[in-house]
């Protein structure tokens, strides 16, 4: 039985597909959904400018918590509009470590993430690491 679905998001198009999949899954099982994100505090505005030009999978490195808040809020609102019990959490750190840690913290039964990586031909490093270290089942959504 699935009671809690966790999903990693950063607001990217790839993450949006994983979020939609996770919302559908939570709705089907009448489960709670937790939207998770990782960020690294930006030390100056030049890093924020650089983040706009960076590939999606590394943009988190230039973000701060304020940058991930809209993605989490939008996802939470979408879930609540469909009648789901939804919460969010963001934490500073490397995405795969943060997702694994927070999935465990929230006692997730399943963790949903997108498949897109830096090299568009192979599974991304975050989903690859998460699939090996997560404390729960992992669903990797094909987004490309």
PLM segments and residue spans:
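Conserved beta-strand positions in the Rossmann-like core of class I SAM-dependent methyltransferases
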Residues: 34, 87, 139
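Structural beta-alpha unit
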Residues: 51, 74-111
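Glycine-rich, Arg-bearing micro-motifs that act as flexible, cationic patches
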Residues: 110-132
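Short secondary-structure boundary segments
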Residues: 37, 115-116, 142-143
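Small/aliphatic-rich secondary-structure junction motif
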Residues: 3-55
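A short acidic, glycine-rich active-site loop
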Residues: 54-70
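Short glycine/serine/threonine/alanine-rich loop segments
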Residues: 31-32, 84, 108, 136
């Amino acid at each position: 039985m699935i009671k809690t679905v966790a999903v990693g998001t950063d607001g990217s198009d790839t993450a949006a597909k994983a979020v939609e999949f996770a919302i559908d899954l939570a709705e089907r099982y009448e489960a709670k959904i937790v939207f998770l994100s990782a960020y690294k505090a930006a030390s100056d505005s030049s890093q924020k400018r650089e983040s706009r030009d960076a590939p999606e999978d590394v943009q988190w490195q230039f973000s701060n918590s304020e940058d991930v808040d809209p993605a989490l809020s939008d996802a939470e609102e979408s879930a609540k509009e469909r009648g789901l019990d939804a919460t969010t959490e963001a934490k500073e750190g490397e995405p795969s470590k943060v997702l694994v840690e927070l999935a465990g913290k929230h006692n997730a039964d399943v963790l949903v993430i997108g498949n897109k990586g830096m090299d568009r031909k192979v599974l991304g490093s975050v989903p690859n690491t998460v699939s090996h270290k997560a404390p729960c089942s992992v669903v990797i959504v094909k987004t490309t």
